[in-house]
Curated annotation (Swiss-Prot):
Native source organism of the sequence: Tolumonas auensis (strain DSM 9187 / NBRC 110442 / TA 4)
TM helices/strands, residue ranges: none
Protein family membership: Belongs to the YajQ family.
UniProt-recorded name of the protein: Nucleotide-binding protein Tola_0795
NCBIfam families the record matches: PRK05412.1
Record keywords, A-Z: Nucleotide-binding
Record HAMAP family: YajQ
CDD domains for this protein: YajQ_like (cd11740)
Length: 160
């Protein structure tokens, strides 16, 4: 029986490239001259630091622009609150990895409401979709692409 998996993953090498490009742009931009601003990539988050909170807003836009240029979806970013410490401002942007249970249930409900002849199963942080016909699976893929659940989804492990 044909099947595929729905996952939500972030290519960390692309994120690293986007962060490096954003750091380069901050160093060359005129409005960031003489400002101690930087992006720092940790395991699952990007920490931004600047001298003013409006600069953090500009830095988020720079980061989003660089991520889009790397071919990724910006819905994988979860922007945190601005923190003030001394004379610097910090903000943490978390990277969304995996499909949470409540999002998975909403996705399964969307597929089941369409009355497509497929079965769905939650397997950890991914969803397995199986069906008798390849066309049904492609229809389910189209539904998932149209669903706006605040997260980017990819399809892996397609088997006939």
């Amino acid at each position: 029986m044909p099947s595929f998996d729905i996952v939500s993953e972030v290519a960390m090498n692309e994120v690293q490239n986007a962060v490096e490009n954003a750091n380069r742009e901050i160093q060359t931009r005129f409005d960031f001259r003489g400002v101690d601003a930087s992006f720092e990539l940790n395991k699952e988050e990007i920490k931004m630091g600047a001298d003013a909170d409006f600069q953090l807003k500009q830095m988020i836009e720079i980061l989003r622009d660089k991520i889009v240029k790397r071919g990724m979806d910006t819905s994988c970013l979860d922007v945190g609150d601005v923190e003030h410490s001394g004379k610097r401002y910090f903000q943490v942007v978390k990277l969304k990895q995996g499909i949470e249970t409540d999002v998975a249930k909403k996705l399964i409900k969307i597929i089941k409401d369409a009355k497509i002849k497929v079965q769905t199963a939650i397997q950890g942080d991914e969803i397995r979709v199986t069906g008798k016909k390849r066309d049904d699976l492609q229809e389910a893929m189209a539904l998932v692409r149209q669903a706006e659940l605040g997260q980017a989804f990819q399809f892996t492990n397609f088997r006939d």
